[in-house]
Amino acid sequence: MTEPPKICQETPPIAIWGGFLLMCLGMFMAILDIQVVATSLPTIQGALHISPEAMSWIQTAYLIAEVIAIPLTGLFTRVLGLRWLFAAAVSLFTLASIGCAFSGSLSTLLVFRVVQGFSGGVVIPAVFSAVFLLFPPRLHAIATTIGGAVAVLAPTIGPVVGGFITETWSWPWLFLINVIPGLIVAVLTPRLVPRQPTDLAELIKLDSLALLLMVLALAGLEIGLKQAPHQGWLSPACAGQLLASGLGIGIFVLRTLRSAHPIVRLAALQQRSFAVGCALSFCLGVGLYGSVYLMPVFLSFVRRHDAFEIGTIMLVTGTAQLLAAPFAAILESRFGARALTAAGFALFALGLGLSSFQPRTADSAEMFWPQVLRGVAIMFCLLPPTRIALGALPEKEIADASALFNLMRNFGGAIGIALIDTILYGRVAIHADDFRARLLAGDLNAAQAIGLDPSLLANRPAGPPTAEEIAFVRPMVEKASLALCVNEAWAMLAGVAILGLLLALLAREQRN
């Protein structure tokens, strides 16, 4: 085991800043990859002749591997040190990207997606660990702002990047764009980031049973959340799987708390600030990933925009995030984290809530200000909670705590998307039946709501609708019903943001 000099210095050299920026680039690659692939799944499906049911596993395989890797980041950091862990993870991610690009079958693609997800899952918490390991407290706000801006910008611009690549080039380039930046990050990061203690003996003391429990429980939970909206949350198969996953996580936690050499150090959860910070990270995950998922649903299926147009409209959120980032850094270094977090979630709830009133005909103009509010708010929902969660922890707990903090954001996203799908799949038919009944009763307001000229309904002869009339009205009813469900989903996300506001009040005030 090597004993390097203390990393965190009062005046970090330029090399450390360069290394940190390269780490942020690696994190940007990993997060962006999820979104660009999600945007282009139909293209990959057609190229590899994959069924629609199997297509979703291209994303699910990545997400399962990622959620397993995130809590292991602390262990990997203790074994390899920060710089070599990051270099190894980015190298593996780059090689897996090449493998994905040249995959000729679904099975081959899934194998490389698992490798991508596992290596990418290590990268994200490692960056937030670096904020507190490489820099003194007075620079935490600036470093957190840089890392946070990158983390939330990537999902926002992902759709436009994915749409541009699939329309301009071909689907393998969704993965090949990672190669050059991946090589740069893998080669230069270990040269710029200082040494840390390493302890290969951690692998010898590894609790293999706890590791198996964690892998099975997290994978089962991710799959259960994916299937719940389709099969029903209370269906025997889905409910059983979610219950088994929850039981597995409970047993893992009990075993880990009693272990002399835990895989994941959970001691930080005993501190109120860290526990509240994790809850805030969960709420942000619901709103952040939920909104990035929900906007394309509306713009694609209701407004009929293509992938590139959707990405262009969503750039408003990313632009607002970038413009808000320096102000967030200034305020974050001068004011208490609790007050800024509460303000951020209040603004986030407002931006989400405004979208819940958008009409069926809403487009880029109507979506502009809600996007601006959300983009500004997201920076204050990420940066101050990071300081609340990690700012007061001892250095030896940072890596594991950062992993748990980021894991909660990912879980929030998974649960948020599952709840959105539950609303969309479960409520569309209800609204459609209501529209049909109102139209048959001659309700002119219903005609106007679905975009049908009320005079056509008013002047229609009495009697049951003809096949031609049903065919003409059906797509209007479907779009209007989906638009109502989207608004209900926005309202649900706003409710979670309000919960984040209330949780922020429980945090202990911290100032730099």
Predicted stretch roles:
Residues A54, I388, R409-R508:
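Hydrophobic transmembrane architecture of multi-pass small-molecule transporters
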Residues I146-P159, M367-G451:
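Small-residue-rich alpha-helical segments with characteristic i,i+4
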Residues I14-F86, S97, S107-L110, V150, ...:
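Transmembrane core module of solute transporters
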Residues M1-P12:
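Short, Lys/Arg-rich, polar N-terminal cytosolic tail immediately upstream
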Residues V179-P197, L216-K226, S245-R258, L503-R508:
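C-terminal membrane-cytosol helix-exit motif in multi-pass small-molecule transporters
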